[in-house]
């Protein structure tokens, strides 16, 4: 009698890479690579910048899925990176989903990292990382938002795992690092005053640019009426950065806070159009 075959569960794999260069007064493609469920689309822009929309064609991630993204903004380029939709993290039968993102920004270049929200479902498991290398005079804006279930759908995350690790360097020197870990009954953790005080949506904003200090008062004014939010300015070895933490009751309320902040730091440019489709 032959042993029964063991069929491994199907898992999503994806790898995407985009390299941008400055040519003819515009930001253009130098290299584009996509494999598996990772897709990159480049909508038409009407200025010198480039916008890239990232797509996970598997429709979400679950235990054992692996996605890898790499972006390199060449000297003098301006690149906006966003996602087609919210990244949904579904119940994991086994294993942990992994998403790794690497971004390098050359001299005089600017990158906006503006993915739409990550939605955690009950019994989901995700570990993700963001590695950013900036030239000494490059600038960078990053916003990552997370929803702990969808409040309008009555969802709660009573068991799960979410790890989020950031490392941002400027001129080879570490200027920002954070390790977030939510494990177990995430809804109960979020209800604690020292964590989210009952909020089900939260975001981190990091801005590294020469004009950080001049932006601080306007950002504080924008957040003045939001008790669960705050913004600070830091000088790390001569490199300025702004860090804002925002929390809200749900995803809709979170967007109402975030969009004006993002627009202001993008010099009054709107958020990527896919955010409003």
From Swiss-Prot:
Main location: cytoplasm
Function: Required for maturation of urease via the functional incorporation of the urease nickel metallocenter.
Location relative to the cell: Cytoplasm
Stated name of the protein: Urease accessory protein UreD
Subunit organization: UreD, UreF and UreG form a complex that acts as a GTP-hydrolysis-dependent molecular chaperone, activating the urease apoprotein by helping to assemble the nickel containing metallocenter of UreC. The UreE protein probably delivers the nickel.
Pfam families: UreD
GO molecular function: nickel cation binding
Family listed: Belongs to the UreD family.
Claim: Cytoplasm is one of the keywords in the record: yes
Keywords recorded for this protein, A-Z: Chaperone, Cytoplasm, Nickel insertion
CC annotations in GO: cytoplasm
